[in-house]
Amino acid sequence: MPNYCIHGMVVRHGEAFTISDRLTVWKNGKAIYRPTVHYAYCPADVAIASLNELRGSDYQLPENQRILGDEIISSSDILGALLMGHAYNSWWTGSDLSIGESRRLVPHQNATTMQVAISVIAAAMWMIENPAKGVCVPDDLPHEYILKIARPYLGKWISKPSDWTPLKHYTNAFNGHNNPQIDRDDPWQFKNFLITDGD
């Protein structure tokens, strides 16, 4: 379970909008509560190194490209949601699929491919059984149905509390030489999650 700071990248993802939209509380036609939902992704070290090289070459793709396959010797794809700012402080729920387990299930595949592929297969099976439902987003699908198909391919299942907040491990390495914009009174403010030039 990730219980540490992850300097990930906020990636545009449909569920970031649809989950926030689904959890919005309305009163008299006006939204009185709308949670902030973000999709953050932290690539593997080798992928970050490649991204830095790409930036260094002004985003010109290299002539020779390759996708790592069987060369991957260890890793896992930890996928889930960290629900924050409630009586439990933080709660992590998700899955942890190792490269070893994914290759045991389907040789020559990696954990990310496995998680995406089984989700698509489960959704396609639901679509075949429910052709009159029209266009749906992932949140519209019955999670019990999807997980019944997907769970054997998702690795270890995790659901447990965490004492993590964005300020738990906060240190100011340039104390006295910068002015970080953090809110120590309310750790759940978005500014406490941002990594800025002032940090």
Language model features: what each stretch is:
Residues 1-199:
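C-terminal catalytic/substrate-binding lobe primarily of soluble NAD(P)-dependent oxidoreductases
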